Amino acid sequence: MTILHGDDRFYNNIFVQKPIRPCMQDLADLMGNNGNMWDDCNVLTGTFKFNGYPTFDEWNRQFEGYCGMGSETTGNCYYDHLPVWASGNLYFNGARAWEKETDAVTDTEHTVDISIEEKEDGWYLKTNLYDIIKEENDGIISTETLGMAFEPEQKYENPDGSPIIFNQDFFGNHRNVKTVAGPFTDKKASEQKLF
C-alpha cells in the first residue's frame, strides 16, 4: 500500500500567521510554481495545506463493495491520501483552516501579537491573544476523540493502556468541560514563566 500523507489530527489548536520576512517572500516569489519536492516555501500558517484530503467517512466510502485491488469499485484508493481530522481550531492574522474542518473559528477582526520574551528569571509568552479569546468553546480532547491511528490500528492512549484525557493545560491547571483552545486555560496561566 502506498500512502500519500494524511492520518493527521488537529484539535483545539491556535494558529497565528506571523508576518512573512521579506527575504522569505522574495524566495517564494522567485521559485513561483517551480518549487522542488524538498522546499515548497511553506511559510503560510494553518491546516489549509490539507485541502483536498478526505474526511474519514469520505475515505472509508472508497472501500464499499471492495472486490480486490484493481477492481472498478476501488479505483486508486490505495494510492490516495489518508483522512484528516480537524475541529475546534482558532485561526488569526490570515491563518487558514482546512476546507472540511468542523467548528473552526477564523478571526479576521483582531490582530494577534505573539512572541517569546526573555526576562532575568526565564522565558515568557508575550501576547494579546487571551484578550481576544474570551469564550470557552472547545471540548476536552481524549482517546475517544482521537480514535485509532491508521498504521498500528491502535487507539491513542497512555503507555499503560489507560485512556488519554487532555484535561490539564501546559502548567497542570485543570480545564473545564468546555475549555479554551490552545495550551493555557486562561490569560493568567499564559503569563506564567514557560522555562
Regions found by a protein language model. Give the residues of each.
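Extracellular/lumenal ectodomain signal focusing on beta-strand-rich modules
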Residues: 7, 12, 87-88
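Short glycine/acidic-rich loop motifs that flank beta-strands on beta-rich extracellular proteins
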Residues: 19-26, 95-101
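Substrate-binding/catalytic cleft of secreted carbohydrate-active enzymes
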Residues: 1, 26-27, 42, 71
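Right-handed parallel beta-helix/beta-solenoid
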Residues: 1-6, 79
